[in-house]
From Swiss-Prot:
This is Pole-localizer protein TmaR. The gene is tmaR. Pole-localizer protein involved in the regulation of several cellular processes. One of its GO terms (cellular component) is cytosol. HAMAP family: Pole_loc_TmaR. Belongs to the pole-localizer TmaR family. It holds the Pfam family DUF496. Its main location: cytoplasm. It is found in: Cytoplasm.
Length: 112
């Protein structure tokens, strides 16, 4: 029973550790994002080197780059639209859950 009521110092330590854990999780996510970004850059350069051949004109290379840029911009647009659709669905589910919770709270106890 000695540890049943945490001391103020225990609570402070818990909060400190919890905040540190959250900070480390954010740092992990940031590093993972940097890894993904750099892997994508490597892949982009690999793709570019597949298209560029010796003796190509500067204009041909610029055309390839413009085409790749357009493709990536289209993908970004598609992801923005997909993200908006997912966010809309998430908001709708949140509203439904909130409404269900409010109904449950206001129900008389005998009807359950």
């Amino acid at each position: 029973m000695e540890n049943s009521k945490p001391s103020f110092q225990d609570v402070l330590e818990f909060v400190r550790l919890f905040r540190r854990k959250n900070k480390l999780q954010r740092e992990i996510q940031d590093v993972e994002k940097k890894i993904r970004d750099n892997q994508k850059r490597v892949l982009l350069l690999d793709n570019l080197s597949d298209y560029i051949k010796p003796g190509m004109s500067v204009e041909a290379i610029q055309g390839i780059i413009a085409s790749m840029k357009s493709d990536y911009e289209d993908r970004v647009d598609d992801y923005i639209i997909k993200n908006a659709e997912i966010s809309k669905e998430r908001r709708e589910i949140s509203k439904k859950l909130k409404a269900m919770g409010e109904l449950k709270v206001h129900e008389p106890k005998g009807e359950e």
